[in-house]
Amino acid sequence: MHVIVIPVYDDWKSLNKLLYEINGNTSTKELVKILIINDFSKKKPQLNIKKLNKIKEIKILDLAKNLGSQRAIAVALNYLKNVESSFYVTIMDSDGEDDPKHINKMIDLAKKNKNSVIVSCRKDREENLIIKICYKIHLILTFLLTVKWISYGNFSSFHSKNIKKILSDNSVWLAYSSAVMKNTKIKKTYSKRLKRYFGKSKVNFLFLVTHSIKIIGVFYKRVLVLSLFYLLLVNKLFNSFDSFFLIFIFIINAIIVLTISKKNSDKDVNLIKKINYA
């Protein structure tokens, strides 16, 4: 069995197109189920399922409040860990930027590497130059503070035995990609990040800053140690602590502390309002 998890907030038009693409690229031998996480959408769910002949089941988890995609994924994984004993999971976004044609390759890799999470790294991004530059800065800053090169997002596939590993320390409530890096073995594959089916990308500078802080926050102890190392290095090289650098390090750590203090605020609350079948 293969369960495809898709968080969605209002973008039902894109989701319908994505489901059609998934159906067209699914093998008839595979038992495919869709788990949609309705992240407290303002728009009423509208699904066109008439031509989805290869998808065996579509289940919608209606959340009781808006959580954002990362926490919506955490809710989905907590739900799935009690469903079946052995199956494969794919997590992807609903906007069309994750290539549904790449799913079969990822599942094949997951079957060969049951103890690993297959993550799809981006070959290229369909954004403007400024966002591409900001994304590179995000990758470099994240690496400098964590010594982890996290160049992938939600798009991933794995055997269900990895669910408990991903959920083991609650860091998934902060950033799914970091939780995967921290708690599991990963195998990388590469695919081009496509254009959104409809509308404009929500990625902007503020989004990337917030995203970076959440990713870094998962590795806070490592960030603290590296921050001290960089301070000592600057002191040794320049025989003094640079005040600007000191303030920057302090602000980064303060923001991270505030961010991680909120990461578990929802984990013990029943966040699934209703379960529907399409």
Walk through the language-model features, giving the residues of each:
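Cell-envelope/extracellular polymer assembly enzymes that use nucleotide-activated donors
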Residues: 1-3, 33
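Short, well-formed alpha-helical segments that are part of the catalytic scaffolds
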Residues: 11-26, 44
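Short beta-strand/loop segment that forms part of the nucleotide-sugar
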Residues: 30-41, 61-62
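A conserved acidic beta->alpha catalytic loop
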Residues: 38-47, 96-97
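Acceptor/aglycone-binding surface of glycosyltransferases and processive sugar-polymer synthases
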Residues: 64-65, 70-79, 91, 97-174, ...
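Short acidic donor-binding loop at the edge of a beta-strand
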Residues: 83-88
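Catalytic donor/gating beta->alpha subdomain of glycosyltransferases that bind UDP-sugars
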Residues: 164-223
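Membrane-embedded multi-pass helical conduit in multi-pass membrane proteins
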Residues: 222-278
